[in-house]
UniProtKB/Swiss-Prot annotation:
<dbReference type="Pfam" id="PF01531">
    <property type="entry name" value="Glyco_transf_11"/>
</dbReference>
<keyword id="KW-0333">Golgi apparatus</keyword>
<dbReference type="GO" id="GO:0031127">
    <property type="term" value="F:alpha-(1,2)-fucosyltransferase activity"/>
</dbReference>
<keyword id="KW-0812">Transmembrane</keyword>
<keyword id="KW-0328">Glycosyltransferase</keyword>
<feature type="transmembrane region" description="Helical; Signal-anchor for type II membrane protein">
    <location>
        <begin position="9"/>
        <end position="25"/>
    </location>
</feature>
<feature type="glycosylation site" description="N-linked (GlcNAc...) asparagine">
    <location>
        <position position="302"/>
    </location>
</feature>
<protein>
    <recommendedName>
        <fullName>Galactoside alpha-(1,2)-fucosyltransferase 1</fullName>
        <ecNumber>2.4.1.69</ecNumber>
        <ecNumber>2.4.1.344</ecNumber>
    </recommendedName>
</protein>
<keyword id="KW-0808">Transferase</keyword>
<dbReference type="GO" id="GO:1903672">
    <property type="term" value="P:positive regulation of sprouting angiogenesis"/>
</dbReference>
<comment type="similarity">
    <text>Belongs to the glycosyltransferase 11 family.</text>
</comment>
<dbReference type="GO" id="GO:0032580">
    <property type="term" value="C:Golgi cisterna membrane"/>
</dbReference>
<keyword id="KW-0325">Glycoprotein</keyword>
<feature type="topological domain" description="Cytoplasmic">
    <location>
        <begin position="1"/>
        <end position="8"/>
    </location>
</feature>
<dbReference type="InterPro" id="IPR002516">
    <property type="entry name" value="Glyco_trans_11"/>
</dbReference>
<dbReference type="GO" id="GO:0021772">
    <property type="term" value="P:olfactory bulb development"/>
</dbReference>
<keyword id="KW-0443">Lipid metabolism</keyword>
Length: 366
């Protein structure tokens, strides 16, 4: 049994240790919040993390020998916390992701995505931006900025350290200088790429049975656009004449191409696209709730025919090669042209074919 004086000394020592530990944790937590970090998990082993969480690795954190990939780290020169509100469908959120990444880098800020965007994109792509935990999102003193769909000078000098972007940006003018990084972010998971390539390998040209030498992805946007374009935007969707002209453009320039058609209106495609030459394959499943299968097919092709919409844009951007797009698809007085600049939407080297606006002529009459 220790003397009473020794027991008092031990108790005092333990009390000092406990108070020191509590003080350290309080200051550590306050510092992390002050710098915009939601530290749900500290590495080393990222595989133990179940998204959505905000992950940030402290400098010099040792890595587990079994770690399959490094924890996402922001350069020390970056500060603040930026994110973007996930809105719209698959292609919209790809545009929001790419724009957030590019603008945050340009302004020296850390970029985080919200859980809904992670849920939409992570099952398809090897994206690397960390996810902001909901509790961090809710207590962050955000400034908000709605983006228009083209790069502007003011976007290169945004001073807010805690910024939540919104809107539907999908213009190459935001991120084309980072094209290889963007393409890397949107790398398909292996099983999706392999499944798409397996479908393409099985395709044969109808008349000869030969393997095609060139794959041209064709995305035909229909669905809600059939009403939205004429009724709201004084615009049209692609018709069969446009698709025929676009396919002929590729037939004149590439030997033995095969056209891999995907759409959210596959029945219309089968009824209106001429497949008599044996080089048109209706390969899409048209499931809007699970668009990644069609997207993977398009992204694995060599070239692209797109109609309208961000889904087709991203398929073309990732596929590379030649792209033909539907041009001038609204009347000149369309309100759509206030939020959409064709020169900022389509890469300069892409080839536009004018839409048939005759169905809209009654709308143009005084």
């Amino acid at each position: 049994m220790w003397p009473r004086s020794h027991r008092h000394l031990c108790l005092a020592f333990l009390l000092v240790c406990v108070l020191s530990a509590i003080s350290f944790l309080i200051h550590f937590h306050q510092d992390s919040i002050r710098h915009g970090l939601g530290l749900s998990v500290l590495c080393p082993d990222r595989r133990l993390v179940t998204p959505p969480v905000a992950i940030f690795c402290l400098p010099g954190t040792p890595m587990s020998p079994n770690t399959s990939s490094p924890c996402p780290q922001h350069p020390a020169s970056l500060s603040g916390t930026w994110t973007i509100y996930p809105d719209g469908r698959f292609g919209n959120q790809m545009g929001q992701y790419a724009t957030l990444l590019a603008l945050a880098q340009l302004n020296g800020r850390r970029a985080f995505i919200l859980p809904a965007m992670h849920a939409a994109l992570a099952p398809v792509f090897r994206i690397t931006l960390p996810v902001l935990a909901p509790e961090v999102d809710s207590r962050t003193p955000w400034q908000e900025l709605r983006l228009h769909d083209w790069m502007s000078e003011e976007y290169a000098d945004l001073g807010d350290p805690f910024l939540k972007l919104s809107g539907f940006p999908c213009s190459w003018t935001f991120f084309h200088h980072l094209r290889e990084q963007i393409r890397s972010e949107f790398t398909l998971h292996d099983h999706l790429r392999e499944e798409a390539q397996s479908v393409l390998r099985r395709l044969r040209l109808g008349r000869s049975g030969a393997r095609p030498r060139t794959f041209v992805g064709v995305h035909v946007r229909r669905g809600d656009y059939l009403q939205v374009m004429p009724q709201r935007w004084k615009g049209v969707v692609a018709n069969s004449a446009y698709l025929r002209e676009a396919m002929d453009w590729f037939r004149a320039r590439h030997e033995a191409p095969v056209f891999v058609v995907t759409s959210n209106g596959m029945e219309w495609c089968r009824e209106n696209i001429d497949a008599s030459k044996g080089d048109v394959m209706f390969a899409g499943d048209g499931q809007e709730a699970s668009p990644w299968k069609d997207f993977a097919l398009l992204a694995q092709c060599n070239h692209t025919i797109m109609t309208i919409g961000t889904f087709g844009f991203w398929a073309a951007y990732l596929a590379g090669g030649d792209t033909v797009y539907l041009a001038n698809f609204t009347l000149p007085d369309s309100e759509f042209l206030k939020i959409f600049k064709p020169e900022a939407a389509f890469l300069p080297e892409w080839v536009g074919i004018n839409a048939d606006l005759s169905p809209l002529w009654p709308l143009a009459e005084p």
